[in-house]
Amino acid sequence: MDPRPPVVRDQDRIDVRLTGEAEYLIPFTFIEALNEGTLFDRPAHAFLDAAREHRLFQVVNQTTDNIIGTGIIQGSGDERSTKRAEVGGLMFHPAARGFGLCSLLVKIMMVYAIKESGRDSPDEEYLAHVVDGNGLPLHSLLEAGFRPIGPVDVHRGDIDAVIDYMIKGGESVVHMHGFVFDREAIRKLVSSLWRFVNEDHGVITRSDPAGDVRLTVDFSQVIPPTDLKI
């Protein structure tokens, strides 16, 4: 008999948190363990840098104190030109999927990055890349205000990550679908998060043949409720 509790259970409480420097290895090892070959293999120092810049997020089941999801905003590009940041590392434990937690996390990440972090600049582009055949993040990105920019070939060195295992035989690039965040969508995201907190009371439900599973999500450590002004 497995003594470990289920990843999520009915009535569990879920926290979305910024990851501190001392904890950066938690999301790093989480992704390392669960990566299905669809995410960039980012080095540990990329997670440390993101933690220092308050751009590393983790989703934790407060009831069991176990991590169930991650997200990272990784700086890239030449500081002398248009700044770019890669939104990725979106990974949820398979047993925590189907609730809409990934969509919610991306919304929180983008509202925090643009309105709360103090690091955003109007010329910064937030990009996301999804490898061919990986449909899981598409809905989450579109719901969170990203728009498709078409096929993108990612070469070695384009991002601080190992991509060799994603390159198909005989090729030198990874074929991906590109997305860019539409800054005009930020008001809609704030409104969506306000409704989630004030009308849905932070509760999300996944229908299950064995009975509905209800989770209460709190992201006030990242975005105070008073900052969700519409």
Give, region by region, the residue ranges found by the protein language model.
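Active-site rim helix/loop that mediates acceptor-substrate recognition in acyltransferases
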Residues: 32-63, 72
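Conserved beta-strand-loop-alpha-helix junction that forms the acyl-donor binding cleft
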Residues: 123-138, 153-159
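Short amphipathic alpha-helix that is part of the acyltransferase structural core
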Residues: 2-42
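Glycine-rich phosphate/pyrophosphate-binding loop shared by adenosine-nucleotide-utilizing enzymes
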Residues: 64-70, 85
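Conserved acetyl-CoA-binding loop of GNAT-fold acetyltransferases
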Residues: 142-152
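C-terminal "cap" of GNAT-fold acetyltransferases
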Residues: 154-230
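Conserved acetyl-CoA-binding loop-helix of GNAT-fold acetyltransferases
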Residues: 92, 98-115, 139, 143
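Conserved acetyl-CoA binding element of GNAT-fold acetyltransferases
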Residues: 74, 81-94, 129
